[in-house]
C-alpha cells in the first residue's frame, strides 16, 4: 500500500486536525477542493465534483492537509451527492463551530444531469 492510500485509509474524522484561530477580527476562509470523488450508491460508477468550502471561523480553523484527507475518504464510498455534501457540512460545522459556514458540491454532469448541492448555516426556507 502506498503512503497516500495508507493515510486516507487510516484517517479518522474524530481526530481531524484543527488549529486555534487567534485573529481578533472576523474573516472568511475559502477552500476549493477540485478533485472530490465518491461512488454512486446505485450503480457504483464514480461521481466527480468540485467542493467549495467557505466559513467564518470562531475559535478553530481546519488544517488544510486534514481537510484534504477527509475529502479523499469519500473516494470509494457509495454515497449520494446529497448525502456526501450534507455529511461534509455537518462534520465541519460540528468540529469547527464556525460563526457561518457554506459547503457547495458542484458535481460533473453525468447522463446529461448537472447537480449542485449547497448547505449553509444561514439558509432561509421560503414560505
From Swiss-Prot:
Which EC class, in a word? oxidoreductase
Q: What metabolic or biological pathway is this protein involved in?
A: tRNA modification; tRNA-queuosine biosynthesis
Q: Which residues bind substrate?
A: 62-64, 81-82
EC numbers on record:
1.7.1.13
Residues in coiled coil: none
User: What catalytic activity does the UniProt entry give for this protein?
Assistant: 7-aminomethyl-7-carbaguanine + 2 NADP(+) = 7-cyano-7-deazaguanine + 2 NADPH + 3 H(+)
Where does the protein end up? Cytoplasm
Role according to the record:
Catalyzes the NADPH-dependent reduction of 7-cyano-7-deazaguanine (preQ0) to 7-aminomethyl-7-deazaguanine (preQ1).
Protein's name according to its UniProt entry: NADPH-dependent 7-cyano-7-deazaguanine reductase
Q: Which organism is it from?
A: Campylobacter lari (strain RM2100 / D67 / ATCC BAA-1060)
Classification lineage:
Bacteria, Pseudomonadati, Campylobacterota, Epsilonproteobacteria, Campylobacterales
Amino acid at each position: 500500500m502506498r503512503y497516500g492510500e495508507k493515510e486516507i485509509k487510516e484517517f479518522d474524522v474524530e481526530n481531524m486536525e484543527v488549529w486555534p484561530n487567534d485573529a481578533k477580527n472576523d474573516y472568511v476562509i475559502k477552500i476549493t477542493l477540485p478533485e472530490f470523488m465518491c461512488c454512486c450508491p446505485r450503480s457504483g460508477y464514480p461521481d466527480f465534483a468540485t467542493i467549495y468550502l467557505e466559513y467564518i471561523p470562531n475559535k478553530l480553523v481546519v488544517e488544510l492537509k486534514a481537510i484534504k484527507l477527509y475529502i479523499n475518504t469519500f473516494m470509494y464510498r457509495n454515497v449520494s451527492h446529497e448525502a456526501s455534501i450534507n455529511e461534509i457540512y455537518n462534520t465541519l460545522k460540528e468540529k469547527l463551530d464556525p460563526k457561518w459556514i457554506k459547503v457547495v458540491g458542484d458535481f460533473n454532469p453525468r447522463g446529461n444531469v448537472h447537480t449542485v448541492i449547497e448547505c449553509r448555516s444561514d439558509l432561509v426556507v421560503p414560505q
